[in-house]
Amino acid sequence: LLCRVLDGGKLGSKRHVNLPGVRVNMPSITSQDLVDIDFGIKNKVDFIALSFVRDKEDLDKLQKILNKAKSKAKIIAKIENQEGLDNIDEICQSSWGVMVARGDLGIETSLTDLPNIQRRIMHACGKWGKRSIVATHLLESMIENPTPTRAEASDVANAIYEGADAVMLSGETSVGKYPTECVKFLKSIAAKTEKFNTLDYEKNLISSSDWQHIGITAKHLAEQTNADGIIAITRTGETANLVSNAKPKGFPIYTFTN
């Protein structure tokens, strides 16, 4: 790959190369990915995040590898380019959860469109009842500083208002100077935001099964009776997930299993 430097600066090692708008004909799972996946399977990881997911077929390839190894690891689809965004509905249906990987996504699409793209992905996750993770540049300034900016605090809160199930740090905790403080700030912002969140996510949810209706009904009963919590009896955890999809407010979901 030959490049001409137009605006010079410091280039770190092992940096990614982004080609916005270009459909790159490369395998979704590389030889190094296979090594990493094998390591994860042997160490019984709970989740495997697949980068630059373009469509359902990318996820099917990974699922076949996991099935062959009899691994129970769940797949997280990282949305990082326009092709993945265009196929977001089929990707949601074929994965356990979706990550809004804002770093590469902001380069591969448009930085000014990124807030709307994030909302679009979150809406799709809510519609299909899939877990959503917002990642990258949440508290970026805390790599060097002990407190976040006001804009960063608002950004984290906005992700939670949009229905994020998880907000994930990266550089802040991997190379930052204040990893513990980052986690504490993120936890505090999330807890306080959830108390004031009045959005009804259930309206967006596709009730595609009787089980999902039961989850929604459990939420309604708990809210109407001012319950202290919801108890879900489950073997796989899916019953608790069905209740969680409706995002009940103000009380926990307790899970009992054998």
Where is each model-derived feature located?
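Non-catalytic helical/linker scaffolds that mediate oligomerization, partner binding
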Residues: 1-258
